[in-house]
Amino acid sequence: FKAKGMLQGGLTIATIKSAVPKNFRTSHWVGIAKRARIVYFAPDRVSGAELAGLTYESLADPKWKGRVVIRASNNIYNQSLVASLVKNNGKSSTAKWSKGMVSNMARQPKGNDRAQILAVAAGEADIAVANTYYLALMLSGKKGPEQQAAAKKVKPFFPNQNGRGTHMNISGAGLVKGAPNKANAIKLVEFLLSEEAQNHIVNNTFEYPMIAGVSPHPLVVNMGLDFKQDLKTKVVNYGKRQSDALEVMTAAGWK
């Protein structure tokens, strides 16, 4: 939205800057909640030794050939993940990685994030890439008993723990250009970053809170909170590198 000239600056007050890590905000928009894009695995088919030191980069290793499910290249979650790889590893390296990922896919990409988790539960693949809140949503029973049962058959794994950390993305708020009540809009963002609002958000979306001192939903807590988040890669780079990400995925034959 900022790139299209739809947002204005102004989210620079001290309360916002102190609440939100700098990689999750700019003067035009700010993260309100976080989600991690992680790996889900079948514990009966994937060993601890295979997972040791697993990174997004190593998902292209030939040992995972025919074992991986992930969404299509037109999905924004995947575009952001691949954009982060372009930022950290370069376009050429990420192009090679994309080809490895396509080679390792158990099937052509189809369905949403929950469909990837369901595929692992059904034995169609051994590992899936999906956002954290989807597993919690399935475990909650809100998507029905079949998805709840399937979710219990997989385990979460947080990649890149020995390096930059697990890929994080945000739900955010921005200031629309020309908004007549800029001062009140900033106050709304401040409220969304309050303990009261953060508790409401995380217990309804299954995301991670943006501010310290607020606990996620118990189903998210059960997935583990002691993991290293990627605080190095600024979210703004996901947009800047999006076209490169889509280019390398398309060239690799990532449907």
Task: Write out the residue ranges for each language-model feature.
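Short beta-strand->loop
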Residues: 7-15, 29-30, 57, 145-167, ...
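Extracellular/periplasmic bilobal clamshell ligand-binding domains
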Residues: 216-255
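Periplasmic solute-binding protein
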Residues: 1-6, 24-51, 83, 168-173
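Short helix-loop capping/hinge motifs at secondary-structure junctions, enriched
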Residues: 44-53, 86-95, 179-185
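Short loop->beta-strand "edge-of-pocket" segments that line small-molecule binding or catalytic clefts
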Residues: 57-76, 84-86
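A structural signal for short loop-to-beta-strand junctions that line the ligand-binding cleft
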Residues: 7-39, 57, 67-70
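Ligand-binding pocket segment of bilobal, Venus flytrap-like solute-binding proteins
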Residues: 73, 77-80, 84-159
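Mature extracytoplasmic/periplasmic domains
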Residues: 171-232
